[in-house]
C-alpha cells in the first residue's frame, strides 16, 4: 500500500480545483495548471480535501497512485506559493544575461549559447553568476534548469560549471608528477 498515496491533499484558501474524470485543473493566485492522468486511479474531492485512490490491485494502479498524489500536491503548492530554483555559475569569464525572451550564456565556448525562456518561467539575475528561476510548474522548472546545467555541467577538478546553489560537487585531486 502506498504511504504517499494514502495521505489526503488539503486545499488551501484561494485555490480552486476542477475535476473532470482524470483531468485535474487547479487555479490559484500564481496561475493555473492542468494535467490529465492515466492509469487505474480515481480522484475525488471531499470537504476541502483531494483524495487519490487506486481502482484495482494491479501494479500499474499502485504505481500511479503515489505518483499522481505527489504531482497534484506539487500543482497545489505551485499555484499557491510557486517554486524557486537558484543556479550558480562558477568559472573565470562565465556569466549569463537575459536579453528579451532568451537567456544568453557565456561559458568559455567559441560561441555564446542562447536558450529560449519558456513563457511560464521568470528569471531574475541579482549578479552575473547567479540565476534565479521562478515558476508554478515544478516539472517544467526542473527541466529548464537541467537544460541550463547541461550547457556546462560542473567538473570535479576545478569546480567550474553551472550547478544548483547548495549542490555538493565532489572534488578530485589533479595528477601528480
Curated annotation (Swiss-Prot):
Which Pfam families does the record associate with it? Ribosomal_L6
Q: Which GO terms describe its cellular component?
A: ribonucleoprotein complex; ribosome
Question: Whom does it interact with, and what assembly results?
Answer: Part of the 50S ribosomal subunit.
Record family assignment? Belongs to the universal ribosomal protein uL6 family.
Superkingdom of the source species: Bacteria
Q: Does the keyword Ribosomal protein apply?
A: yes
Q: Which SUPFAM superfamilies does the record associate with it?
A: Ribosomal protein L6 (SSF56053)
MF annotations from Gene Ontology: rRNA binding; structural constituent of ribosome
Q: Where are the transmembrane segments?
A: none
Q: What does this protein do?
A: This protein binds to the 23S rRNA, and is important in its secondary structure. It is located near the subunit interface in the base of the L7/L12 stalk, and near the tRNA binding site of the peptidyltransferase center.
- Sorted UniProt keywords: Ribonucleoprotein, Ribosomal protein, RNA-binding, rRNA-binding
Q: Which GO terms describe its biological process?
A: cytoplasmic translation
Output this protein's name: Large ribosomal subunit protein uL6
Amino acid at each position: 500500500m502506498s504511504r504517499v498515496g494514502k495521505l489526503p491533499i488539503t486545499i488551501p484558501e484561494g485555490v480552486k480545483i476542477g475535476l473532470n474524470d482524470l483531468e485535474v485543473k487547479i487555479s490559484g493566485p500564481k496561475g493555473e495548471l492542468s494535467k490529465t492522468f492515466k492509469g487505474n486511479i480515481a480522484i475525488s474531492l471531499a470537504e476541502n480535501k483531494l483524495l487519490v485512490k487506486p481502482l484495482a490491485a494491479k501494479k500499474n494502479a499502485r504505481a500511479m497512485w503515489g505518483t499522481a498524489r505527489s504531482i497534484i500536491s506539487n500543482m497545489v503548492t505551485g499555484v499557491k506559493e510557486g517554486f524557486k530554483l537558484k543556479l550558480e555559475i562558477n568559472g573565470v569569464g562565465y556569466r549569463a544575461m537575459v536579453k528579451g525572451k532568451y537567456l544568453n550564456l557565456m561559458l568559455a565556448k567559441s560561441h555564446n549559447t542562447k536558450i529560449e525562456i519558456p513563457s511560464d518561467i521568470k528569471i531574475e539575475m541579482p549578479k552575473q553568476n547567479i540565476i534565479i528561476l521562478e515558476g508554478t510548474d515544478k516539472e517544467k522548472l526542473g527541466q529548464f534548469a537541467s537544460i541550463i546545467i547541461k550547457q556546462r555541467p560542473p567538473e570535479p577538478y576545478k569546480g567550474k560549471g553551472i550547478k544548483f546553489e547548495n549542490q555538493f560537487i565532489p572534488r578530485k585531486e589533479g595528477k601528480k608528477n
